Amino acid sequence: MATEGDKLLGGRFVGSTDPIMEILSSSISTEQRLTEVDIQASMAYAKALEKASILTKTELEKILSGLEKISEESSKGVLVMTQSDEDIQTAIERRLKELIGDIAGKLQTGRSRNEQVVTDLKLLLKSSISVISTHLLQLIKTLVERAAIEIDIIMPGYTHLQKALPIRWSQFLLSHAVALTRDSERLGEVKKRITVLPLGSGALAGNPLEIDRELLRSELDMTSITLNSIDAISERDFVVELISVATLLMIHLSKLAEDLIIFSTTEFGFVTLSDAYSTGSSLLPQKKNPDSLELIRSKAGRVFGRLAAILMVLKGIPSTFSKDLQEDKEAVLDVVDTLTAVLQVATGVISTLQVNKENMEKALTPELLSTDLALYLVRKGMPIRQAQTASGKAVHLAETKGITINNLTLEDLKSISPLFASDVSQVFSVVNSVEQYTAVGGTAKSSVTAQIEQLRELLKKQKEQA
């Protein structure tokens, strides 16, 4: 239990804090990850204090030396947290005083924990986004390069989980890659706002000591400084934005996972997961469970929950700082950890996935070419609605005869429309089917190749910006 003297603001209070209140108030377990960035921010602030003549050069050197020692202790895992340490900022302040004495107290001159916590979080998320972006771009690259290698594999495309049209396997892979590039772009947009520095905003009114905020920005490698001190210490838009982007990203990853789970079932058999990303059954020895994909799918719900939680926290608070904002770190750091793990697992799954080309070919049943039969008639001059009706009649006739549509005779087809001729046989080819979709974005080989090249160029640009 903290005594009066242990409290950071002990001079105002009499008596001790309820121990349960201390547990509720403490965020030290979550905030230990902020240790290094808090030290970086403190070093920058110390330099600004020296420039403002609040610290002498000797005092600055002592403070920087002490902070370097704390950083070293932290990296070695020997930085001790005490019961009175409410958060990482108070822990570092306490340890600095133990190392260099009362001079440590000067570091907080004109600085509030309100600005410290938001600065620390922004600094940490800045580096975290870079890591997440790297993993995301690697996943996109894996999808794109696999699409390039396996461009000649053709599979059924589905709508409503029912066979629709033949498509290239690569077209399927690229559909997910394209969605993920939008997530990569959104991460870049969030990073722009995260790199706006709030340090120098004080508790809410600003800094009264002529602190050079441009110096702080430069020292911490941020892009700009906040415009208004009240907004700076209270806004958590960047937390909501990052978790929102993560939510969309997890939706896309969940969709990819669900597709592959379906394709890996014995009923489909299109793909086989590597043993490294599968598990067995405790009772059924024949089973190979896609646990990696199921976990990716389920983690989406975890991220969605974090978004709802932080929105509810922010919805209920007034302007400036409130203790409610302590919830931001646990929410966003959990999302960061989830994304970091999920993206690496997803990349592992895609890079080791076995494609069962033969099973895909077997699933390319003739009814998939019914639309092509209609398009054949359209090219002969028949309006599309009439062509669809004629194609439907051909399907019905084949079913009545107990044969597949490609086994209908020319006479059978001519009984439906005189526009059918001997060249209709070319319709019943899955290669010819996919090759007619040459428009930009289509599943023809030329179009898929163009998509691959465009995505490679986009990846280069996004990698430079990550």
Swiss-Prot record:
Tissue specificity as recorded in UniProt: Eye lens.
Keywords: Eye lens protein
Alphabetical list of Gene3D superfamilies matching this protein: Fumarase/aspartase (C-terminal domain), Fumarase/aspartase (Central domain), Fumarase/aspartase (N-terminal domain)
GO molecular function: argininosuccinate lyase activity; structural constituent of eye lens
PTM summary: The N-terminus is blocked.
Database matches in SUPFAM superfamilies: L-aspartase-like (SSF48557)
Signal peptide: none
Subunit structure, interactors included: Homotetramer.
Protein name per UniProt: Delta-1 crystallin
Phylogenetic placement of the source organism: Eukaryota, Metazoa, Chordata, Craniata, Vertebrata
Gene (name only): ASL1
